[in-house]
Structures are given as structure tokens and as C-alpha cells.
């Protein structure tokens, strides 16, 4: 179970549904089991990387039309988190190629507390917005980043 449609207005993509660069190498990422509504799922815990790149894709046919969705990622910065003083790029790309992009610095976020990282908002309204919805979170600067845990990416009305 890597994604879960909780209702027609709430959709979750768990970390295993994402493409996380270096996630198959235990020197950089580890997978922590968590219970979610009786399902055994995993959070992705970053040990350290310099090339931080996380990508998710969902088909908009899984979403309800003419409903505004708020897209966010659950993140926790551990007590030893560091290297987050350069901006992360957040992108939400619609099937028609239109993009929402922003940047965020995580260095000053509270430690050991889950928070929502806002990715954007969207509405699936017609054939131009039907297809693959792509969400990205990345920073390719060479400084080492460590100590973040990724939870689910949520699309909720």
C-alpha cells in the first residue's frame, strides 16, 4: 500500500510511492515502519545526502473534478537536522504543463515536530487537467542535508 484514496476529497501518497534519489542505499535513507489505520507503512528518514530530490506522480483521474485540493507534504526535522539553510524548491506541475513553484528554507523549523510543507493548490476541471500530476521537492546544491523524515504527501479538499 503506497497510496490511499481515503475519500473522493482526500488522497495520500506514502513515501514508498515517491521517487527519492538514493533511497535504495541505506547510507543515505532508512525506512521506518509506522501503523496507519491498521496498515503497516513506512516513513522515509534521511541520513544524509547532498543531492536531495523527491518526486511524486498521481493520475488526476483518481481525484474528484471541480474540487479545489490543497497539496502538502508531512515533514519532521530531527534534533540533529542540518544543512537546510539553502532553499528547497517545491513544484506542482499539472498535466497541461502549467506549474506552481516556490521555495522554502527548513533550517529554522521546530525539531521533532511534524509540520505541513505546502506544495500548492489545484482543481481538476477539464481534459486539459486530466493526466499525470507531478510534485517535486528538491535541492541539488552540494551541501550535505541530514535529519529530515518524510511522511505522506496529501491532496485534500
UniProtKB/Swiss-Prot annotation:
Pfam families: PP2
Main localization, broad class: secreted
Matching InterPro entries: PP2-like (IPR025886), PP2-like/Lectin (IPR052147)
Tissues where the protein occurs: Detected in fruits (at protein level).
Subcellular location: Secreted
Keyword Ribosomal protein among record annotations: no
GO MF term list: carbohydrate binding
Subunit-level organization: Homodimer.
Keyword Lipid biosynthesis appears in the UniProt entry: no
Gene Ontology annotations of biological process type: defense response
S-S bonds: 37-54
Keywords: Disulfide bond, Lectin, Plant defense, Secreted
Top-level taxon: Eukaryota
Function statement: Binds with high affinity specifically to chito-oligosaccharides. May play a role in plant defense against pathogens by directly binding with the chitin cell wall. Forms filamentous structures at higher concentrations and may promote wound healing by forming filaments with phloem proteins like PP1.
A cellular component term, taken from the record's GO annotations: extracellular region
UniProt name for this protein: Lectin
Amino acid at each position: 500500500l503506497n497510496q490511499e484514496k481515503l475519500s473522493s476529497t482526500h488522497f495520500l501518497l506514502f513515501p514508498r510511492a515517491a521517487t527519492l534519489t538514493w533511497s535504495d542505499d541505506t547510507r543515505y535513507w532508512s525506512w521506518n515502519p509506522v501503523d496507519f489505520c491498521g496498515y503497516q507503512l513506512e516513513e522515509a528518514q534521511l541520513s544524509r545526502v547532498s543531492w536531495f530530490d523527491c518526486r511524486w506522480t498521481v493520475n488526476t483521474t483518481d481525484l474528484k473534478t471541480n474540487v479545489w485540493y490543497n497539496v502538502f507534504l508531512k515533514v519532521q526535522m530531527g534534533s540533529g537536522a542540518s544543512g537546510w539553510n539553502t532553499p528547497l524548491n517545491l513544484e506542482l506541475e499539472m498535466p497541461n504543463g502549467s506549474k506552481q513553484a516556490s521555495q522554502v528554507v527548513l533550517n529554522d523549523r521546530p525539531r521533532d515536530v511534524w509540520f505541513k510543507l505546502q506544495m500548492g493548490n489545484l482543481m481538476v476541471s477539464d481534459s486539459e487537467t486530466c493526466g499525470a500530476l507531478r510534485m517535486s521537492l528538491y535541492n541539488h546544491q552540494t551541501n550535505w542535508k541530514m535529519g529530515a523524515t518524510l511522511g505522506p504527501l496529501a491532496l485534500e479538499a
